[in-house]
């Protein structure tokens, strides 16, 4: 029978694992780091009563990422329903209603911070998504749940005021929303701002994408306005454009985390496709000849500016959180 090989790899972390006859860890770095990893690995596997798990650490930046990888391997291979939760700088591993393992960083954590709340609903780290869209929230809840983080949205805070997006750039708008809501709630907040940039129009509609044809414009009206602006641009190569997304995570007393991504393409001459929204029916993806509205949801999520930005965020978020 073929032995399963598990792997996680991004720019910051790279782990490989398999199951054999005994627990074993390898790491070809400095001795001090190796000793720390061995102590951690032995403590976790012994506590979870795991045998035969073999782990190789190639690159490591995030204890959370490493624990999540190990638990994913155990879940897939052994069917264990293990969950990691972040709480006040520690990592808690549980199964069902039982707390099995606590990982504390070398510098320790504040006892008052760790035990300060008697309210079970306050237990664990929380990320507030600056949206009322339940579909978007569901996707982020799935992603951050793997990092042991509870996700809420603005529907959980009905009394919060609306934050006007008055910035001149995507980052300014995303920062404004995330940092304002973080100050008001004391929570860690994720916000995004996205739009379409057409090169020959100097980057327009840009931050005004949703209201290009007016404050209450519909998608159809915005698309018609864009086609009108490009009516005299006959050379397809000069109709280049990109969708852009900026994501900002803000938290009290921290420097905000910023990631962004572009999805390059061209503006077509007529709407095509029934999927998506906004400018999707006009946006020709790369050199495929297909509009974003002709892609399936899965295809779009894999390629799009938002999908790329979220991938970047999930790679750098654990390291950002550990630095604070």
Swiss-Prot record:
Its EC number is 3.6.1.66. Binds 1 Mg(2+) ion per subunit. Residues 127-324 are annotated as: NTP pyrophosphatase. It catalyses: XTP + H2O = XMP + diphosphate + H(+); dITP + H2O = dIMP + diphosphate + H(+); ITP + H2O = IMP + diphosphate + H(+). Residues 1-126 are annotated as: Unknown. It is an enzyme of class 3 (hydrolase). Mg(2+) binds at residue 193. The keyword Iron does not apply. The active site is at residue 193. Substrate binds at residues 131-136, 194, 277-280, 300, 305-306. HAMAP family: Non_canon_purine_NTPase. PANTHER family: INOSINE TRIPHOSPHATE PYROPHOSPHATASE, INOSINE TRIPHOSPHATE PYROPHOSPHATASE/HAM1 PROTEIN. Belongs to the HAM1 NTPase family. Pyrophosphatase that catalyzes the hydrolysis of nucleoside triphosphates to their monophosphate derivatives, with a high preference for the non-canonical purine nucleotides XTP (xanthosine triphosphate), dITP (deoxyinosine triphosphate) and ITP. Seems to function as a house-cleaning enzyme that removes non-canonical purine nucleotides from the nucleotide pool, thus preventing their incorporation into DNA/RNA and avoiding chromosomal lesions. This is dITP/XTP pyrophosphatase.
